[in-house]
Amino acid sequence: VDLTNILEIYGGVVDYFDPFSLVNGIKQVEHVPTGYYHTDAIGDSAVAYIEQFSKNKSPFFLYVAHCAPHWPLHAPEEEIEKYENTYNLGWREIRRIRYQGLIDKGIIRTENAKMPDFMFPELDWESNPNAKWDSRAMAVHAAMVDRMDQSIGKLVDKLEATGELANTVIFFFSDNGASSERPSKYGPGFDRAGSTRDGREVVFPVQKDSMPGAQTVHSGIGPEWAHTINTPFRFWKAKSFEGGINSPFIVHWPSKITDKGIVKDNPAHVVDIMATCIDLANTTYPENYNGHVIKPTVGKSMLPILMGKSTEGTQEVYFWEHFGAAALRKKDWKLVRLEKDGPWELYDLANDRTEMNNVAESNPKIVQKLKKEWEDLAQIYEVYPAPN
C-alpha cells in the first residue's frame, strides 16, 4: 500500500487551524504554515493528487474525507462574516424556510413528508438568553460548509482542466445527520486537546460565554440546530430515526448519467459504495489478501439506479445499530428504536417519510417479523456480544 499520497488526522476531532495529529504521507506534521486551515489543506492536497495522477492513463481513486462541519466550530473570520445575521431568525423560522425550500426544489413532497413539530416546544427564540451565541454558532457552521464547498469546486475545476471531469464519477455525501453534540459536556481528553500546540488554553464553554469560531474555543451547534439542519426529519446523529441516518447523496458523471439534475428516492447504504466502485472498475471483490480470507462485501452496486435501470433500492433489507439505537428497513416498512431498552416503533415510509405516525400497535405481526430479522442480522453483523 502506497502511503505517500495521504493527508490525514487521527481521531474524530480536529483543531482546524493546527491539527496536533496531522500526518502527511508517513510523517507527522509538527509545524503548519501561517494561515493554515484544515479544510483548505484537504482540498489543496486533493487537487495536487489529481494533477499528479492525471499524467498517466491509469484509473485513479481519490477519497476526500473532509472533517467539516464536524465540531469544533472553527472557521476563518472572513467566512463567518458572510453569515453573520443569517440565523438571527432562530430555529423555528429557519426550519420553516428550509422545509419550503425542499418542497420548491422537488426534493420532498408534502403529501408523504409533512414537517414534524419542533422537538423542543418549551424553547422560544425570542426569549432565548443565548440567541446571539446560538446564531453565531450556526454562522460558523455555515462558514465551514462554505469553505468545504469552495475546496470541492477547486477539485472539480482541476478535473476539468486536466480533461478528466467527463469520465470521473464523483460521489458526495455525509456520514450521518447533523450532530447534536455539545463538546462542553466532554471537556479535554482523548482526541480533544486542552491547549493549542503553542500553549494557549482551549475552553469548552458550558455557559456559552466564549463565542464560537476561534481556535481556542471548542463548541458545537447543539440539538436545536441539529434538528433544524435535519429538516424535515426528527433526531440527529447517533440515532436511527431518519434525522440520524438519512444523508444527501449527489452523484456526478457527465459522460454516462443521462438523468441530470433529478432527484431519486431509491434507498441505498454506504456499504453500497464499494460495490459500485467494483462494478465501475469491471472487476470482482477479492476473496483473500496476504493469505487471509476476506469477508464478502454486503454492498450492492448502485449502477442500475444511476443509469436509470432500476426503481428499487440496492438491498432487500437495511440494518442499523449504534450504541443501542437501532433500525431495520424492508421496502417501505421501517422498524426503529431510539435507544437500547426503548420500544420498537414502526413507520410506513412510503406514506410517512418523516416518521410521524407510529403504526406498531396496529401491525404487531409486522413488528415481530421485522424484529426477528433485526435480531438475526445483529448476530451476523456482530452487534452481539457487545465489542470491548
What are these regions (language model features)?
Residues 1-89, 93, 97, 119-143:
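Formylglycine-dependent
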Residues 2-3, 7-8, 214-245, 256-266, ...:
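C-terminal cap/loop subdomain of S1 sulfatases and analogous C-terminal strand-loop tails that border
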Residues 4, 62-72, 113-122, 171-180, ...:
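Short, solvent-exposed turn/loop segments enriched in Gly/Ser/Thr/Pro and often Arg
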Residues 6-19, 63-65, 72-80, 114, ...:
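Short, solvent-exposed loop/turn and secondary-structure capping segments
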Residues 25-32, 80-85, 132-138, 213-216, ...:
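Flexible glycine/proline-enriched surface loops and loop-helix/loop-strand junctions
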Residues 43-51, 85-109, 130-168, 178, ...:
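A long, amphipathic alpha-helix that forms part
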Residues 55-62, 164-170, 313-315, 330-333:
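Loop/turn elements at helix/coil->beta-strand transitions in domains of secreted/extracellular proteins
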Residues 114-120, 124-136, 273, 318, ...:
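Long, internal low-complexity/basic segments
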